[in-house]
């Protein structure tokens, strides 16, 4: 299917058709819509190689994730990746997943960047002090950080206010009378983990609550289960528990249910960041910190990346969303 056939049908020039499909601003919106509609009707697909030679772009984005903390068992992460990929596909852009050791001196994604096989990077699970961000900025490589950039560099980033998430949840529990609130926190140095931990600590300190019950655990059901079983064996177990991720939260809920402490007269209040996974066997409406829908997040991230590869200033792309607290049925006054 050629541009000439589309041009003949619409009664316009081949040049106009080409520029309309290329997204040039000198083509009227109404004309572009007619051209795009006719192209879709005919099943027209542009010559990708020719377009890449013309624009100098590869139409590919790399998403870098930590190889030592593989997030593929996280439904939250995989849902986000799926949505980003789907949204970028609307622009005929492919998403490549790149495993990388964030602490290494030589990063795997640099080979793709230097060989011009990708147009930009998305850096997932940023560190609180991330040398990759500094390196990419100095090298002039377009990227979007999923997490705020504490170095203060003029970089593009998208983040949730993770501090506010756990702070809100802890404040709600304190308002109900809880004084012993445990946190199951991921045993990593990712920026979002540290922010969630600090939000919990700050809320406790604001009310003069000391000796916090902090357990550093891997983000797995098993780790959450074992940590809660240990906490509930203490002489003075916590009256409330917050988990900073969904998988350890599911394990925590299973442990409490097994102990008969998820509901009833001796129930322990439970809040799970991101809510329980979709495949959880827990039937209660567990309290959660909600970070918007996966589709909205994917759309936001893909839109920011699209702006980056089309020349938008990184400083203009620094966005933070605030999560909300959902009380569910597992938050209540202390029962013991």
From Swiss-Prot:
This is HTH-type transcriptional regulator RafR. Residues 2-55 form the HTH lacI-type domain. The keyword Membrane does not apply. It comes from the Bacteria. Keywords: DNA-binding, Plasmid, Repressor, Transcription, Transcription regulation. SUPFAM superfamilies: lambda repressor-like DNA-binding domains, Periplasmic binding protein-like I. Homodimer. Changing residue 50 to E: Loss of activity. It holds the Pfam family LacI. PANTHER family: ALANINE RACEMASE, LACI-RELATED TRANSCRIPTIONAL REPRESSOR. One of its GO terms (molecular function) is transcription cis-regulatory region binding. The keyword DNA-binding applies. Residues 3-22 bind DNA. Repressor that negatively controls the expression of the raffinose (raf) operon by binding to the raf operator (rafO) DNA. Acts by binding to two operator sites, O1 and 02, which flank the -35 raf promoter box. RafR bound to 02 alone results in 45 % repression of transcription, whereas RafR bound to O1 leads to only 6% repression.
